[in-house]
């Protein structure tokens, strides 16, 4: 199957220390010129992404807040894919001194080791929320919301099958994302556990690793099997 789209994480995948290099951006432009789609999938809030990467318009869709927000840069339309954080829950975290405490449209963000307080409040209030780690960051989201669900929402709007997508990431919150795509790649600086999930690990780290994958897509060196890894075999017909 042909590669129809590249979906990439932002921090320490596309970007290093929050910045995308000119070389990496040029690679994105080359892929765009090949009439393939570009999707950014990040745990960051959308206003934050716009600030650190003003050229967000190169992407056909942006999935922010770890799958909770879907954005179309061409129209500036946004779609919330998950409910807002419970106000009482947010207030309880503030009262218990959780700092930093970043509240998005759906995601709540903080840092390790605050996850113990967060987990205690989730249990105490009986909330259906999940804690997702991203290296030293801690994200709290409604159950079932992740980068994979956000990717699927983006592909639905673009009218593309997931089997033709190459996904690339580096951290804990990229596992489902890489598994769901037709082909999953981990950059060289990715966590060891994600490298085990990936179909391939790049030789170069971060943005250079993304450029490496793009070069291989353009050369036709990445082949996605016609039988999706997401399909489940439920039986076999014996002949003879």
Model-derived regions, located:
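Conserved phosphate-coupling serine/threonine residues in phosphotransfer and NTP-handling enzymes
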Residues: 42-44
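Asp-based phosphoryl-transfer active-site loop
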Residues: 2-18, 178
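HAD-like small-molecule phosphatases
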Residues: 50-156, 230-240
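Short active-site oxyanion
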Residues: 35-39, 60, 77, 106-107, ...
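Short, well-ordered beta-strand core segments
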Residues: 6, 31, 62, 184-186, ...
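Mg2+-dependent phosphoryl-transfer enzymes with acidic/Ser/Thr/Gly-rich catalytic loops
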Residues: 1-2, 21, 148-240
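Anion (oxyanion) recognition and catalysis
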Residues: 32-33, 94, 123, 195
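Basic, amphipathic juxtamembrane/active-site segments
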Residues: 18-34, 186-188
